[in-house]
Amino acid sequence: MEAQQILNNVFGYNTFRTGQEEIINTLLSKKNILAVMPTGAGKSLCYQIPALLFSRGSIIVSPLVALMDDQILSLKELGVSAERIHSHLSEEQNNKTLQDFKKGLIKILYLSPENLMSDRTLYALQDIDIAMFAIDEAHCISKWGASFRPQYEELSKLSQIFPDAIIASFTATADKNTRDDIVHKLCNYNAKIFVQGFDRPNLSLAVEQKTKNWKEQLLIFLENKKNNSGIIYCLSRKETESVADFLNKKTFNAIPYHAGQDAILRKNNQNKFMNEDGIIIVATIAFGMGIDKSNVRFVAHTSLPSSIEAYYQEIGRAGRDGNPAETLLLYGLNDLFQRRRFIELDKSDDQHKLGENKRLDSLLAYCEAPICRKKALLSYFDEEIESCNNCDNCLQPPKMLEGTELAQMALSAIYRSGQVFGAVHIINILLGENSPKIIERGHNKIKTFGIGKEHSKDFWQGFIRQMLASGHITINIKKFGCLQITTTGVQLLKNELQFNYKEIELKSHKTTKNYKEKIPLNIQDSDLELLAALKKLRLTISKSLSVPAFVIFSDASLIEMAKLKPKDQIDFSKINGVGPSKLKKYSDTFLSVING
């Protein structure tokens, strides 16, 4: 049997997506690979199809239990002999699974890196001829990456312990340094690298200065989205609860998700989000990696992510079905201070902290870039594209203004107050605020006191952010977040450099100009009623089987059913995502709704 037959007869798809076939054929020729593929490009098929064609068993390394469980449920629905081993299962179950894999009864076995590299598992696998190790989220092995995990580094031993096994590594986010590090550690540079590109044309990007009324900014972004699924990322557990409560009072259907919740509640909230439409999950970064919900229509951040890689991964959870999806990032000076503080408090070595700070600098530069958001984002991954004409900067190009004198005001306030105060104090000096701290320090008597009072506090926050992004000032976390002047800042203060800044918009309703009234799903209004009925049927079946709804059929398959309206089993078998197993199980039930 060939790859095309597996695609048609097992997975129920007619054609491969871009790049899939070449990766699969390379693996079938027994060569190691690293595939960098954007979210939603279908990377799981790239290792699942070869695993079914190899005569021996394959092991998939996955970091999350939830992801393993979902993948196994999906594969079993297709009639594939697949299993997983993890700590949430009993020792008896795990032992039986391992024995079945050794006997050849299981073709695909999912393991976490910790489980795989344990002495016990390696001992059990030592006499097995394993065809392939497929490593998902492979960027976690690299110290160059933003998501380095020590347990992933142990995987570098696989090529020595199992020299005949193919190593297939997959990731959605890896710049050149990270890619080189992955193939060095996993394959000693003996791998073919596939880089499909990082662009997600269906995503629209926007960044806004976070105001005091940032929840109202969020509310405006959510206009016309009440029936859509979305994710809102917050920095703290407390904030997730607060935002979810705020949205529920505004008649949205929002649920919080964070590591501090009871495990059962957290699991129930995740299942609700996965199985139902119109749910907004308000989460910390504990949520998301490996979440396979295709119809997430928006992702919003209420504060700064940790890096460009983290931001790219998190917004990548929107629009996996290829339909338009929106993203919004709100951030302010305090977010930047918090992120710098997190890095400083981390127990990692100085080199790692330096790398984390550089990644944060890159994200800050992206946020303040006056050019196309997609151009700015993808340039970080060494990819050049034309302007997207779909982000806030393309739809409303920002004005660039001459700001040398304003910059000198801020720099002078920092210098004259001794470079030992944070942004709040510096802004109070510029505004001429007679606060107790200002008076106590005598800063109401320095020349720059009140020199910037014709501008607002929000303006100065945005302006100082741009100066930070330009590298003229820096935040010294070791000295309690004080602002300090850099070498280029000194040159600017001495009039040896000029400074232009992006016009600072302080309107909280800016968002409404950037977003379309309705997200098109490429389906006629007359078919929406049938689509709703098919989704209802899917939910009923999924609940009866205790599996996520997407395991039954993806949204894309349901949309195709609603549009094409298959009359019989032959027509139904032509729907993408309908293989022999699902045809047998579900065709009669779904056809009765379609033709009823």
Regions found by a protein language model. Give the residues of each.
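Accessory DNA-binding and partner-docking regions appended to nucleic-acid-acting proteins
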Residues: 1-3, 355-357, 384-596
